[in-house]
From Swiss-Prot:
A Pfam match: Radical_SAM
Protein name: GTP 3',8-cyclase
Assembly behavior: Monomer and homodimer.
Residues where [4Fe-4S] cluster 1 binds: 25, 29, 32
Organism classification: Bacteria, Pseudomonadati, Pseudomonadota, Alphaproteobacteria, Rhodobacterales
Species of origin: Dinoroseobacter shibae (strain DSM 16493 / NCIMB 14021 / DFL 12)
Gene3D superfamilies documented for this protein: Aldolase class I
Protein purpose: Catalyzes the cyclization of GTP to (8S)-3',8-cyclo-7,8-dihydroguanosine 5'-triphosphate.
Gene Ontology annotations of biological process type: Mo-molybdopterin cofactor biosynthetic process
EC number: 4.1.99.22
Entry's family note: Belongs to the radical SAM superfamily. MoaA family.
Key word S-adenosyl-L-methionine present: yes
Keywords assigned by UniProt, alphabetized: 4Fe-4S, GTP-binding, Iron, Iron-sulfur, Lyase, Metal-binding, Molybdenum cofactor biosynthesis, Nucleotide-binding, S-adenosyl-L-methionine
Length: 336
């Protein structure tokens, strides 16, 4: 049976779903959450079986790429069961890619299993190569553990992209070392501007903000940057460093509107569907999922109704030294 694909009001095909499987994390990164973060009661979270049904419904409606996020997805109990279940959609060809964003803390344990489940690429969030600064930025993290995880992932056959948040006064001096380190290990690298989402305690996001336009100018002191006309439907813009052949990505939600080709929606660990990372509009998909356990039609209708409300663009704004666009929810809940 042919199913009509998900098309939003601006004629963008929605074929990429990002799913947060937990809001919990074993780090407390200063730009992400407070050290005394209060997490959701477990009863509010979708079960692994419900996540399977939810994702399978999206795949039936045309989703081709599924990225699992958190929190830290690998701290969710029995998460490998979910990945193993999702692999059937890769085997059938219904799903083109199953992937993961992780802080790397659990990779040493799970890398082989992830590859066996059909993953071939993962993103690892890591902002510094300095062990002391790593402990400072993550509060609870340990760099050697993450580096062992990265080694294990590469040994298992997983291709890795490092995501580094650009933080003013913190990792500015590591720009070239990070580029060199990734080049030596044949890993892609993307720099990300800090996002204005959720209460993070005493930290000041505006003080952390390092415009990637400044970062690019610093890179030009050493490298020739060639713009790549590469579009993934996502926020990253890519350049090639001619001296090394490396590909670098830049995600600039605050200084560059990346919305025109957006092909994705985000499902939280509680079953809320956010049509845009930078807006608060959402749809409750947990309700039809649980009210009709043996019939997916209500869930399909709710998904289509939500996609019909997808906005053209986001509301992030750091202009005039304000936090006008700050979202109240946390990335750990929405999915990073």
């Amino acid at each position: 049976m042919t199913t009509t694909p998900l098309i939003d009001p601006f004629q963008r095909a929605i074929d990429y779903l990002r799913v947060s499987v937990t809001d919990r994390c074993d780090f407390r990164c200063v730009y992400c959450m407070s050290e005394n973060m209060t997490f959701l009661p477990k009863k509010e979270l979708l079960t692994l079986e419900e996540l399977d049904r939810m994702c399978s419904t999206f795949i039936r409606l045309g989703v081709k790429k599924l990225r699992i996020t958190g929190g830290e997805p690998l701290v969710r109990r029995d998460i490998m069961t979910f990945f193993d279940r999702m692999s059937r959609h890769l085997d059938s060809g219904a799903l083109r890619e199953l992937t993961l964003t992780t802080n790397g803390s659990q990779l040493e344990k799970f890398a082989d299993g992830l590859y066996a489940a059909g993953m071939r690429r993962i993103n690892v969030s890591m902002d510094t190569l300095d062990e002391k600064k790593f402990a400072e930025i993550t509060r609870w993290g340990r760099l050697p553990q993450v580096l062992r995880g990265i080694d294990a992932a590469q040994k298992a056959g997983l291709r890795i992209k490092i995501n580094a948040v650009a933080l003013k006064g913190f990792n500015e001096d590591e720009l070239f070392p990070m580029v060199d380190w990734c080049a030596e290990r044949d890993m892609d690298l993307t720099f990300i501007e800090v996002m204005p989402m959720g209460d993070i305690g005493n930290e000041n996001r505006l003080g952390q903000y390092w415009a990637l336009s400044d970062l690019r100018n610093t890179l030009r002191e050493r490298f020739t940057l060639t713009e790549l006309d590469e579009r993934t439907g996502g926020p990253a813009r890519y350049v090639r460093l001619e001296e090394t052949g490396q590909k670098l990505g830049f995600i600039t939600p605050l200084t560059h509107n990346f919305c025109e080709s957006c092909n994705r929606v985000r499902l939280t660990c509680t079953g809320e569907l956010f049509m845009c990372l930078g807006q608060e509009d959402n749809a409750d998909l947990r309700k039809p999922l649980r009210e009709y356990p043996d019939d997916d039609r209500a869930l399909e209708n709710a998904i289509r109704a939500a996609i019909a409300l997808k906005p053209k663009g986001h509301d992030f704004d750091y202009s005039r030294q304000r936090l006008d666009g700050q979202m109240t929810r946390h990335m750990s809940h929405t999915g990073g």
